């Protein structure tokens, strides 16, 4: 089916889940609503976004293209390493990996819709490679300009970061804010009145993903560890 938006009841489900996140409540009151009001439209949105990415030139710009399509997360939390043992997620997420440590994200929660581009390194060496690129005058200035344009468009540049500064970086470094990052999530949030209950919600995600492309392109070209060539796909060096 064609994606036509999330019903108002989808957001109310997450309000109710925040009030009672128990297995019994899920079985008796939440599960059927989740499948109908959240999961079904998110599956439709994921299919639509997969087609969008496949038909766009994300593949050429990043050296990949998310050939597996947009993946929709399940509702059950992994609580093994968490002090919070509540069993169910308070959001519905979906993601697309473009390259290792680089991808696109969207989620729905009780506040509305959030879409972003993400860099999520798994090792300190990857963070070091990113910081070296930021410290270079040409690459660092380019990233600072990209970040400034995104913030002017209403993006928030979030993600895990140091509270102080990396070792050896002076306190007056012009790009200290960028150098503090250990992960980057550049995204925009949309409330219910932005059109979430219509097909406009899909347009908002596509517009956000398109706007964040310069950041993803910069990461692919300058900050990621080069990947082996596979199936004729050009990988940035």
Task: Please give the residue ranges for each predicted region.
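Sequence-level motif detector for i,i+2 pairs with an aromatic at +2
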Residues: 70, 112, 181-183
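Long, solvent-exposed, polar/charged low-complexity segments
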Residues: 1-17, 21-23, 41-46, 50, ...
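Short histidine-centered catalytic/ligand-binding loop motif
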Residues: 31-38, 119-120, 128-135, 197, ...
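A contiguous pocket-lining binding segment that forms or flanks enzyme active sites
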Residues: 116-167
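Active-site acidic/histidine clusters and adjacent loop/turn architecture
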Residues: 11-75
């Amino acid at each position: 089916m064609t994606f036509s938006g999330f019903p108002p009841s989808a957001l109310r489900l997450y309000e109710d889940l925040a009030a009672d996140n128990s297995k019994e409540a899920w079985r008796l009151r939440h599960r059927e609503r989740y499948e109908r009001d959240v999961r079904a439209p998110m599956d439709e949105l994921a299919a639509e976004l997969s087609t969008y990415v496949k038909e766009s030139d994300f593949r050429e710009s990043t050296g990949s293209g998310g050939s597996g399509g947009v993946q929709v997360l399940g509702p059950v939390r992994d609580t093994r390493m968490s002090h919070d043992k509540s069993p169910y997620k308070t959001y519905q997420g979906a993601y697309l990996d473009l390259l290792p440590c680089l991808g696109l994200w969207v989620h729905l929660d009780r506040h509305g819709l959030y879409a972003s581009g993400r860099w999520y390194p798994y090792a300190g060496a990857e963070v070091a490679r990113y910081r070296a690129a930021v410290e270079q005058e040409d690459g660092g200035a380019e990233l600072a300009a990209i970040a400034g344009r995104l913030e002017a468009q209403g993006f928030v540049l979030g993600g895990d970061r140091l509270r102080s500064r990396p070792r050896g970086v002076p306190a007056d470094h012009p790009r200290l804010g960028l150098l503090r990052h250990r992960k980057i999530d550049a995204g925009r949030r949309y409330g219910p009145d932005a059109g979430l209950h219509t097909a406009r919600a899909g347009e908002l995600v596509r517009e956000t993903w398109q706007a964040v492309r310069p950041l993803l392109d910069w990461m692919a070209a300058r900050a990621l560890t080069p990947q082996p060539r596979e199936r004729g796909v050009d990988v940035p060096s």
